[in-house]
Amino acid sequence: LEGGESSVKATKERLGGEALSADFWQQLRDQQHGFFSLNEGQALWRLSLPPHTPALELAVDESDIFYDWGGSQRWVKTALPADTLRDACQKAGGHATCYTPHAQGGAESPFTPLNAVVEKYHRNLKAELDAHGIFNPGRLYAAF
């Protein structure tokens, strides 16, 4: 909960429950929480979605999904192909980033491929800021 002190207090009293320790939030931030332990063949994905997006139709056990930011950010542990996750996110107006690309062979970028217009802007910006292509070549996208 966040907001003014009296608003947070009133909402907390209405909702009930117990406050979580700062350790929980730090473990979550640093991906040290037990949720982030992967099984053989699983990759860790961060799905970024518009607020109020309902559950995506994915063949993933609910225990392998961690909802954050009111559901706008979802951590998913799965062996599903990258295209399956990215297509589902795109249909919902979001995108997916793989945090463990080595788990999927590391052959592709962890980031959602750019459409032609956005890629043009990326290339032009990179050309302006890094004319000699020395800063992290291929780091975000293999093509530049």
What are these regions (language model features)?
Residues 1-23:
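A conserved active-site cap/scaffold subdomain adjacent to cofactor or substrate pockets
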Residues 17-144:
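Conserved glycine-rich FAD pyrophosphate-binding loop
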